[in-house]
């Protein structure tokens, strides 16, 4: 990142490497503050015409109005109102209607708070710069500087100090340290080599963001040409998040205009250590937000067999401005790779439960979006006090099954976090996540929160499967748990992948997708069919119970009670 400050698409980025403001005068004299005032005045012209017209008429031009805001703010941090007017009488315009000026100051503060704000430090080599000792401290000091400057201006104009203070996040919502590192870059991807890697992420929750889209549409198809060959990314516009998606080392390149999705990865996937990617070749590369000139959405993957790298691609357009396009492409890439490795991807949830009587069980609940897998976990959590001594979430959307050397089938996760609908969480639990969640479009349908729920060590430990259940969200049933002795019947239910859509995508009504997993198995169906029969046969031989759990999630009036009732019945079965 070469500029000290950029502002676009409601996102402000402040480069601490080039400019770090530690006094009020430095802050108010900075290029970044001027850009913020310019953007604020443009928003006034659009949304607060009366206020805009009043001041532009008084100062003759918009440029003079902007300069007068900046200069008067500088003076107000040092002098009282009378002294400011004495410096230059033109500033008296602001104090002729003091209430209007206070409203202007408040509106500017609100405008700044509504922006997504990021601070960045870039180091030319590891161990340099602010990040090792002072990065978090520098962000805390910057937050306090912005807050104290704003309050000083308010107090000076009012003529008295405030008596109630609210310690809000006035600096950055999130902060990144970047390192320039070398990785084993094939010649085809030399245009990616200069992009800095994210080494540290600091999030100031609650982080609330608004995106252009609120649902995801379609599936990702294989492409026959490499979309990354010969492209060159501008190091001023791009970042790399080195993620561990399950067992796959993944380099996620994202454009700065989709910053919230890149930062959201920190709550969802393990951030790799430098030793895990310096000089290494990744399993997966995903480029998110490349401006290729196409107006329509282009999202696909390509198998680079020569370099043994799976490539994901999403072009720059408003349609991809939803975290689902970041998360689900990465999971698709992961699953395609796991199928190549003869492992079976599972779209669902897995939990390790230890009951109060000491009995332990590892449960896999499989189902596509809206089937009730996450809601079942919430129901388990709500029953914690009555039944459970301990509960570990192995995965809460995507995982994979692996055949171990002793022949047992074990489950592994892909994510350390979850991207879940706020409406489907218990309200108390949803509010408990305020101190660590990234909230997206919280006032809209399909509002989401990305929260950490596990550790990488837990999801990659490997847990032997005891129960394998398909989440049926659309059939009424008095018996919530049904097991099948006929393996072919069970496989048909799992492969049919039926569920009633709940609005998490653009689908409606009763829909089906092969193996309830449009993120890999649908694209690689022939290979997956072989694996399904192998794994289900091995599980049956190993005594794993295979069946359905009726969540009733899509049945009118059952969205809350259905998963709860199913969880109670499941615990009774485990307890037998």
List where the protein language model places each region:
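Pre-Walker A adenine-sensing motif
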Residues: 340-356
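Glycine-rich phosphate-binding P-loop
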Residues: 355-386
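Conserved nucleotide-sensing/catalytic segment adjacent to the nucleotide-binding pocket
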Residues: 388-458
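Phosphate/oxyanion-binding active-site loops and adjacent basic polyanion-contact surfaces
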Residues: 100-104, 322-330, 372-373, 527-528
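Charged, amphipathic alpha-helical linker segments immediately N-terminal to NTP-binding catalytic cores
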Residues: 110, 288-345, 542-554
């Amino acid at each position: 990142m070469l500029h000290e400050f950029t502002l676009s698409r409601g996102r402000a980025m402040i480069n601490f490497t080039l400019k770090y403001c530690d006094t009020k005068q430095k802050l108010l004299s900075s290029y970044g503050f001027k850009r913020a005032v310019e953007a604020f005045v443009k928003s006034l012209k659009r949304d607060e015409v009366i206020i805009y017209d009043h001041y532009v008429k008084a100062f003759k031009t918009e440029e003079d109005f902007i300069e007068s805001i900046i200069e008067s703010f500088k003076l107000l941090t040092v002098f009282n109102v009378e002294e400011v007017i004495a410096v230059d009488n033109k500033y008296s315009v602001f104090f002729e209607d003091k209430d209007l000026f206070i409203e202007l100051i408040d509106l500017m503060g609100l405008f700044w708070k509504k922006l997504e704000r990021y601070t960045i430090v870039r180091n030319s080599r590891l161990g340099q710069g602010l990040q090792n000792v002072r990065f978090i401290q520098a962000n805390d000091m910057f937050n306090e500087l912005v807050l104290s400057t704003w309050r000083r201006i308010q107090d000076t104009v009012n003529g008295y100090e405030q008596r109630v203070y609210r310690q809000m996040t006035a600096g950055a919502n999130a902060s990144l340290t970047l390192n320039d590192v070398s990785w084993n870059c094939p010649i085809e991807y030399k245009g990616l080599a200069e992009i800095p890697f994210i080494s540290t992420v600091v999030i100031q929750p609650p982080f609330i963001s608004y995106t252009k889209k609120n649902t995801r549409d379609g599936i990702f198809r294989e492409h026959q040409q490499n979309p990354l060959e010969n492209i060159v990314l501008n190091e001023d516009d791009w970042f790399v998040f080195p993620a561990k998606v399950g067992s796959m080392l993944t380099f996620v390149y994202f454009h700065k205009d989709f910053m919230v999705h890149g930062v959201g990865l920190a709550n969802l996937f393990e951030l790799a250590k430098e030793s895990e990617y310096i000089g290494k070749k990744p399993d997966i590369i995903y480029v998110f937000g490349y401006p290729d000139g196409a107006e329509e959405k282009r999202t696909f993957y390509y198998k680079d067999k020569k370099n043994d790298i799976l490539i994901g691609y999403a072009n720059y357009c408003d349609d991809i401005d939803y975290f689902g396009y970041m998360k689900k492409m990465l999971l698709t890439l992961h699953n395609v790779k796991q199928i190549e490795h003869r492992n079976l991807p599972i779209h669902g949830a897995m939990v390790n439960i230890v009951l109060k009587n000491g009995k332990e069980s590892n449960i896999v609940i499989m189902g596509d979006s809206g089937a009730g897998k996450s809601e079942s976990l919430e129901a388990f959590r709500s029953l914690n006090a009555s039944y459970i001594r301990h509960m570990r979430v192995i995965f809460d959307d995507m995982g994979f099954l692996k055949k171990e050397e002793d022949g047992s089938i074990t489950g592994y996760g892909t994510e350390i976090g979850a991207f879940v609908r706020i409406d489907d969480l218990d309200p108390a639990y949803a509010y408990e996540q305020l101190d660590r969640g990234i909230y997206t479009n919280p006032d809209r349908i399909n509002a989401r929160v990305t929260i950490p729920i596990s550790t990488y060590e837990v999801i990659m430990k490997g847990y032997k499967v005891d129960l394998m259940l398909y989440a049926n969200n659309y059939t009424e049933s008095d018996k919530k748990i049904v097991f099948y002795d006929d393996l072919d019947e069970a496989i048909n239910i799992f492969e049919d992948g039926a569920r009633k859509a709940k609005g998490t995508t653009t689908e409606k009504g009763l829909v089906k997708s092969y193996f309830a997993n449009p993120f890999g198995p649908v694209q690689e169906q022939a290979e997956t069919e072989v694996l399904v029969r192998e794994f289900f046969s091995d599980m049956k031989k190993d005594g794993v119970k295979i069946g359905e759990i009726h969540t009733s999630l899509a049945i009118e009036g059952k969205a809350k009670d259905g998963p709860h009732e199913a969880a109670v019945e499941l615990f009774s079965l485990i307890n037998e």
